Amino acid sequence: VLAALFVVASILFAGCFSDSGPPGYYGTIIVPRAQEFRWSDGGLPQTFDPAFAAAPPDTDAVRALFEGLTDYDPVTLAAVPGVATRWESSPDARVWTFYLREDAKWSNGENVTAADFVRSWQRTLKIGPLAPHTDLLSNIEGSGGNPPPPKTEKQSKPIPIFGAEALSDHVLRVRLHQSDAAFPALVAHPVFRPVKVLDANTTNRLEPDHLVSNGAFQLSGKEGDRVLLERAKTYWDGASVSLQRVSFIGSSDAEDALAAYRTGDVDAVTNAAFEPLALKLLAGYRDFRRSTFGALTYYSFNASRAPFDDVRVRQALAIAIDRERVSQDHLGGATEPAGKFFPDEMSGEKPVVNEDELIEQDIERARALLSDAGFPDGAGFPTIRLLINRNDQQRIVAQAIAAMWRSVLGINTEVVIKNWDEYELAVKAGDYDVVRRGMVMQTTDELTNLRMLFERETVPVIANSIPSLAKPGEVVKPEAPVVTTENEALKELRAVPIYFASSFALVKPYVNGFGGNVLDAPSLKRTRINTGWTERQP
């Protein structure tokens, strides 16, 4: 087997030490003379519709073609102006007002208006579950089909049912069910980007042949295994966009993408499923990049049944896990151990969880907690039923953690493996003691991420921090900082973070501004080809 792996490696890396490129870089470097970016992004975009885009490369194409109220700074992930030049909120952060720029245009020359956003969001809600990220709109009043508030005698007209309202062509007001101080960051997500539709009931996918967009780029066509974008002439900030052309280049698999990069046919490779051996061999190259990706694997306890209703038991099981060993030894170093629920990069300006609050292995304390809970050395503790979906990686992780619980606490574990449909039914029925869950964070908005991580019915601490849905006009006290809620969640440990995924990329040294981040969302608006790049000798 090892011999076969090295044969594969020799094929993958053939020619990488040739004189065609500077030392330390993978493969050939041919500096382009034009502002064209050739991107192998895990395949070709299958949709250009913000409502239907689920993941890269679709979401990357949508971010290039459409602009929302805000965008992310690709480095800090702070919300920066997009179509909106500024925004303000009510004191309780439940009502947000966005002021749109007057020079924002669609690619057909028409003005982008606040009504475009209202219609687009209503359309996404109308599409429903077929739109993969509809749930991100759930905090907007009226998004869940709530009945309209009764009309009072003092009101000249009823309060609009839907919480997004165009006060004028260039002023948009959004009412939320609950306070969200980071709402401007949430609306940077592709699902909030407007589309040119005349009717909010239009649920068909946007057709590429007649696509009208408002972003820095517009769709120019498809040539063989390439989807082509060109800089939009109508974009309000076109002068700051360097790239004239972007080519999404298809590849059959990671080896195909790697071969194209090695020969200089593409400028960047992202979202390729590299094998562990390939990752180890690539790690030494200067153009290889690795970053933490906001995809969390965690274990959730069924705290409605004994003995998992005892926080001491949950804490003991949590700190008996050696996350570093799981990531390094069992997953080949391709993941990052998670001592909390959100990566550091999500915290931004806010305080982060203190070092002493991180979940780390502590064998002696784990044993003491289990003994205090009435199970010294695991005596009398029932066999844990650990439910996972059928997946080789998750099986390896589950078996490793089960072995740690056995060696540290003397507790036996039955790993229950089910196909996805059966797994989901078991989760809904609560037919488990511990269950493997996963979440890909779509935003830096921690309130939204907490809503995705925890269900009110199963996590009282989180439930107490999320008020019941308020009616329009009701006064709601401002929320406590979300990081406090994360701290409380770490104390209660109804769920236990295990590891974050990592994202990997190869980027030619002459490509500037194409940086990775925890959302795996690089900005093509900031990307530039340094046509005069040369290798500087040390």
Residues covered by each model-derived region:
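A structural "hinge/loop" feature
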Residues: 28, 41-62, 83, 110, ...
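Extracytoplasmic/peripheral linker and loop segments enriched in polar/acidic and small residues
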Residues: 30, 165, 327, 359-360, ...
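N-terminal lobe/hinge region of extracytoplasmic solute-binding protein
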Residues: 39-91, 122, 210-213
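Aromatic- and charge-enriched surface segment that lines or borders ligand/interaction sites
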Residues: 85-136, 173, 260, 307
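Gly/Pro-rich hinge or "lid" segments in bacterial periplasmic/extracellular proteins
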Residues: 147-159, 165, 169-171, 176-245, ...
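Extracellular/periplasmic solute-recognition and catalytic clefts
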Residues: 220-228, 247-305, 328
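Ligand/substrate-recognition segments at binding pockets and active sites
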Residues: 224, 371-441, 503
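Structural transition elements
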Residues: 336-373, 390-396
